[in-house]
């Protein structure tokens, strides 16, 4: 192995790493993929949402054999206080299309399937292999990797860093800084197992239809965070995540937060009688556009979570990961076909292609949103949810109080909680961050 040279080494076998490895291998490049887990997906027991369009671009016939759980036909958005939720949902029969747009998946199963596709495309995949550091030449160019296996350096023309948000290779090589606590969320998740027919009945589903619930409000106890519930075939993925900086400041327990969420009056009936078999914690990049590090250099590129490519506003991550991996693979293959060296100047093609994609266009649009939610979390995740719940209950409760008095009471509660200036300021800041 030490005497063998590769066109590319991919570090990591998650969504972005698999997309990059598959793209390059399917174009004839000699690719080595290194994964520290026992198998791809071994550290990803949780459920997730798969965005079909992005995978279809890479593997057009993926639906033939991919381990898909349910196709999503309904999306629910909840704003919670301690005893209720106010929300909206969208459900459409259009989502029962021949090639559905979104699916729920179990990452452990899906990542193994994706890795088999990578191998079939011609890449070599080595698991239980930790890359300890990048190998650099005298000029500082990446020329390969050092691993915990015997044999020294494994050489390659370029290294793709797909090591996740807390990967150490880029920081050790000083290609990027350690992500700030306010740019990373910690999500804790559980898998609740129920019979398929019970899930269908509780959520009003048939066949392999699926439903997603996303909730924000007092469930995060004043922190910037989100709760979620995904329906799988015979299980429910439940979780909640908040900024690491807020966990540190409040000393809230992630486990206690999850326990409170699953016992919320709106959630508890959906989980009744379930058996919990799996628990996981996961770090998620939340810094947005302003937290994106340098994406390329001499002999290296960075993709997916390691590049902070996550759209927190729309809760999209796997699609950005797959797309960035694919684009990195396409850029490297194009440079290789021209017989150009993998220099920083040439690898800037990756960034140029990413700039033209939805990935950076979307992240750039919401560049100010992470800071707004981080610095104003109590109002957006406690004050306003409580006021919304009070207003909704006031609206639907029929008790003989004149409607004009109810409207005045709702307005007075808003002004008392935030003041007129506070309300205007929050609305303007939110509008500016959203535009």
Swiss-Prot record:
Domain of life: Bacteria
Entry cofactors: FAD
Free-text function comment from the UniProt entry: Could be required for the formation of a functional nitrogenase Fe protein. Probably accepts electrons from FixA/FixB and reduces a quinone.
Keyword terms of this UniProt record: FAD, Flavoprotein, Nitrogen fixation, Oxidoreductase, Plasmid
Annotated residues for binding of FAD: 8-22
GO biological process: nitrogen fixation
A Pfam family assignment: NAD_binding_8
Annotated family: Belongs to the ETF-QO/FixC family.
Record carries keyword Flavoprotein: yes
Cited InterPro entries: FAD/NAD-bd_sf, FixC-like
PANTHER family from the UniProt entry: ELECTRON TRANSFER FLAVOPROTEIN-QUINONE OXIDOREDUCTASE YDIS-RELATED
Protein's UniProt name: Protein FixC
GO terms assigned for molecular function: oxidoreductase activity
Database matches in SUPFAM superfamilies: FAD-linked reductases, C-terminal domain, FAD/NAD(P)-binding domain
């Amino acid at each position: 192995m030490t005497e063998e040279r590769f066109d590319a080494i991919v570090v990591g076998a998650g969504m972005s790493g698999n997309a990059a490895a598959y793209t390059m291998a399917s174009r004839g490049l000699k690719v080595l993929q290194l994964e520290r887990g026992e198998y791809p997906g071994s550290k990803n027991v949780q459920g997730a949402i798969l965005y079909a369009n992005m995978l279809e671009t890479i593997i057009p016939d993926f639906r033939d054999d991919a381990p898909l759980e349910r196709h999503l036909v309904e999306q629910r958005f909840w704003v919670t206080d301690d005893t209720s939720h106010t929300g909206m949902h969208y459900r459409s029969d259009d989502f029962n299309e021949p090639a559905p747009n979104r699916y729920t998946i179990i990452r452990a199963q899906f990542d193994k399937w994706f890795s088999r596709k990578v191998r079939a495309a011609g890449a070599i995949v080595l698991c239980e292999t930790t890359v300890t550091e990048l190998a650099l030449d005298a000029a500082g160019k990446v020329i390969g990797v050092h691993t915990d296996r015997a044999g020294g350096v494994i050489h390659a023309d370029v290294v793709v860093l797909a090591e996740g948000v807390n990967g150490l290779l880029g920081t050790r090589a000083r290609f990027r800084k350690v992500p700030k606590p306010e740019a990373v969320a910690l999500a804790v998740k559980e898998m609740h197992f129920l019979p398929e027919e019970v899930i269908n009945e509780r959520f009003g589903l048939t066949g392999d239809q699926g439903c997603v619930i996303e909730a924000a409000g007092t469930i995060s106890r004043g922190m910037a965070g989100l709760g979620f519930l995904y329906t799988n075939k015979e299980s429910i993925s439940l979780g909640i995540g908040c900024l690491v900086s807020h966990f540190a400041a409040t000393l809230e327990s992630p486990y206690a937060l999850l326990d409170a969420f699953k016992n919320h009056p709106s959630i508890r009936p959906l989980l009744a009688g379930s058996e919990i078999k799996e628990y996981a914690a996961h770090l998620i990049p939340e810094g947005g556009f302003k937290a994106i590090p340098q994406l390329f250099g001499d002999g290296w590129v960075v993709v997916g979570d390691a590049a902070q490519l996550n759209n927190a506003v729309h809760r999209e991550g796997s699609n950005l990961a797959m797309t960035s991996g694919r684009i990195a693979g396409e850029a490297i293959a194009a440079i290789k076909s021209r017989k150009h060296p993998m220099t920083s100047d040439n690898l800037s093609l990756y960034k140029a292609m990413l700039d033209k994609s939805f990935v950076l266009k979307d992240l750039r649009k919401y560049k100010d949103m992470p800071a707004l939610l981080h610095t104003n979390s109590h109002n957006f995740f406690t004050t306003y949810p409580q006021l919304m719940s009070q207003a909704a209950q006031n609206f639907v409760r029929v008790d003989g109080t004149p409607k004009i008095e109810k409207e005045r009471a709702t307005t007075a509660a808003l002004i008392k909680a935030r003041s007129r200036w506070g309300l205007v300021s929050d609305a303007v800041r939110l509008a500016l961050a959203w535009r």
